[in-house]
Amino acid sequence: GHYDKYVERGIPVDEKFALSISELTMEDWILTFKLDITHPIAILIERTIAKLKKQGNYNITDIISSLEKDEKSDNQTKNAATGLFEAADTWGVFEREGQDPTKIKDLINAGTTTVLDLSVYNSVGAFNVRALVISLVSRKIFNQRMDERKKEEIAAISKGLDYFSEQEQKENPLVWIFIDEAHEFLPKEGKTIATDALVQVLREGRQ
């Protein structure tokens, strides 16, 4: 969403960045929109996302269309929910129609430092977009590394080798994640959308 603006201003950039909206969970949206789980808007969003996930990949346009067609909620609730997703569409963080979302393998290369500039995304005010991005990227990096670790252990066992002494180059190596102002996403009280993902990385990420 901000790539073209950077190019126009002569700011060095390498690749576009875009998240797949279908990877967000119901809890992600509740935390992002700061809703109570029992609020009518949250209930409508939960029902809508659950239905769309059964269909596979979807985008914001699909979400808005499904919200508008909901027969269980009143117009005021549907308009409010639709407005939230129309706002999300302006964040410049989700893939557009015809655009492929960023893959984790594009961000991770052994011996290479990848900088993901989140300064263009809002972290204060109504929506914490930076926390949303950090949550999804951290979660995907962690899950990919866990899957790779299982493959490495199975391969080591099949070779009759000690997994921990094996020094082969890993296809998906261990990743160091450095987050500027990380305390903003791990508050002493309460939580952000990034809190659970970061806590999991802190507890289990050494693998």
Model-found features: residue ranges?
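P-loop NTPase motor domains
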Residues: G1-R203
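Anion (oxyanion) recognition and catalysis
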Residues: R206
